[in-house]
Amino acid sequence: MNLYIVTGTTQGLGRALAELIARDAANELVALARSAEGPIPGGAAFEVDLADAAALERACDRVEARIRGKRYEKAVLVNNAGVVAPVAPLDAADPGELARNIAVNLTAPMLLMRRFLRMTEGVAIRRVINISSGAGRRPISGWSAYCAAKAGLDMASRVAALEAQSRGHAVEVVSLAPGVIDTGMQGAVRGASPEQFADVERFRRMKAEGTLRPAADVAADILRLEAAGRLAGEPVADLRELDAGTGIRA
């Protein structure tokens, strides 16, 4: 049996990942999302606000109780949940939205990695896939919190991978930028004004020209590479630069 813990499964990439995982009878899916509505057949769902560290710890306690005593061949954590707001210049950003962005996009994945590594100790194959963004690797006006959080997630992944290697732990960690996906988050971005988000017209053109990838296609690519063990290697990677046949950067 394989264990998959996935966050942000209400919609978008997280939903697509969860549905694909749950289709395989060899997988046990544990979904963490802000809403348990629309349950995924074959999966267990836990409702939690990832911005609330105490609530997240309680949810992890429930997950740990669920999996305690079970034997898994493989355990995979997918930190997918994310928020882009506030979309605004830093001096115009809402303080609460700034704090929530960092909490959901950076603090929550780190807390989940911590608990995942502890609760899956002894599982032969352990993998952490942190869904990052190209925004963590270059500055984008209007996205100060999102860029900072994703850059932090990349570095947290590097450190986690280094610690696993130096301590002889068999854990693969990758912070993966999946490319631009056709999701609700993209819709919110396109609704911003040019004053809030200088690149808004470029994002609107991508939608109009059909260059956004469907979430289901991206999810299938990620899971195919993961199942083949081809996301191992560099702890910070871009799905668009990975050759689907070899898992090696082009």
Briefly describe each language-model feature range.
Residues 57, 73, 84-99, 118, ...:
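Conserved mid-core segment of classical short-chain dehydrogenase/reductases
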Residues 10, 14, 18:
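N-terminal Rossmann NAD(P)H-binding glycine-rich loop of SDR-like oxidoreductase domains
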Residues 133:
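Residue(s) in the substrate-gating loop at a strand-loop-helix junction
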Residues 22-39:
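Conserved glycine-rich Rossmann-like NAD(P)H-binding loop of the short-chain dehydrogenase/reductase
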Residues 113, 149:
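Active-site helix of classical SDR
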Residues 41-54:
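Rossmann-fold cofactor-recognition segment
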Residues 91-110, 153:
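Catalytic Tyr-X3-Lys loop
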Residues 171, 175-176, 183, 191-249:
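C-terminal helical subdomain
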